[in-house]
Swiss-Prot record:
One of its GO terms (biological process) is mitochondrial translation. It comes from Saccharomyces cerevisiae (strain ATCC 204508 / S288c) (Baker's yeast). The gene is MRPL28. Belongs to the mitochondrion-specific ribosomal protein mL40 family. One of its GO terms (cellular component) is mitochondrial inner membrane. The keyword Mitochondrion applies. InterPro entries: Ribosomal_mL40, Ribosomal_mL40_fung. It holds the Pfam family MRP-L28. The lineage of its organism: Eukaryota, Fungi, Dikarya, Ascomycota, Saccharomycotina. Component of the mitochondrial large ribosomal subunit (mt-LSU). Mature yeast 74S mitochondrial ribosomes consist of a small (37S) and a large (54S) subunit. The 37S small subunit contains a 15S ribosomal RNA (15S mt-rRNA) and 34 different proteins. The 54S large subunit contains a 21S rRNA (21S mt-rRNA) and 46 different proteins. Keywords: Mitochondrion, Ribonucleoprotein, Ribosomal protein, Transit peptide. This is Large ribosomal subunit protein mL40. Component of the mitochondrial ribosome (mitoribosome), a dedicated translation machinery responsible for the synthesis of mitochondrial genome-encoded proteins, including at least some of the essential transmembrane subunits of the mitochondrial respiratory chain. The mitoribosomes are attached to the mitochondrial inner membrane and translation products are cotranslationally integrated into the membrane. It is found in: Mitochondrion.
Length: 147
């Protein structure tokens, strides 16, 4: 019985072997109504172009649920804004501290200051060129970077 099943490789077959039902699924085939490669390419291009215009569906909420939703959204945006302000304040304080220490170094030892700010010959990728970020950049590389 199983030998007959394998003669039809492109179909799912339901067989009864010794009182039990066996479901055998084989290789899928393309449907006969598939588009030509040219038509498929056009469909793909149109779907890619329209992907940027697709908007999520508007929520249809009751009035109370809408008020709750808007309140939560507003609180979330305020929280995000506070986080950004905290982060910016911390970065500003770090920058001012670095600036003060560099000015102090310049006053105390101009020779050390020059050595600290000297460009290193043969260094292909300066650390100042890229900073660590949470997300990948829009432009992958700055080809015209000069120090």
């Amino acid at each position: 019985m199983l030998a007959q099943t394998f003669k039809k490789p492109h179909r799912a077959v339901l067989e009864q072997v010794s009182g039990t039902t066996v479901f055998i699924r084989n290789k899928r085939t393309k449907s006969k109504s598939s588009l030509s490669p040219l038509a498929q390419r056009v469909v793909t291009q149109l779907s890619v172009m329209s992907a940027s215009r697709k908007q999520p569906k508007l929520l249809k909420l009751a009035r109370e649920d809408l008020i709750k939703h808007q309140t939560i959204e507003k609180c979330w945006s305020i929280y995000q804004q506070q986080q950004r302000e905290r982060r910016n304040l911390q970065l500003e304080l770090q920058y001012k501290s670095i600036e003060r220490s560099m000015n102090l170094l310049q006053e105390l030892s101009p020779r050390l200051f020059e050595a600290a700010n000297a460009s290193e010959k043969g260094k292909r990728f300066p650390m100042e060129m890229k900073v660590p970020t949470d997300f990948p950049p829009n432009t992958l590389w700055h080809y015209n970077f000069r120090k």
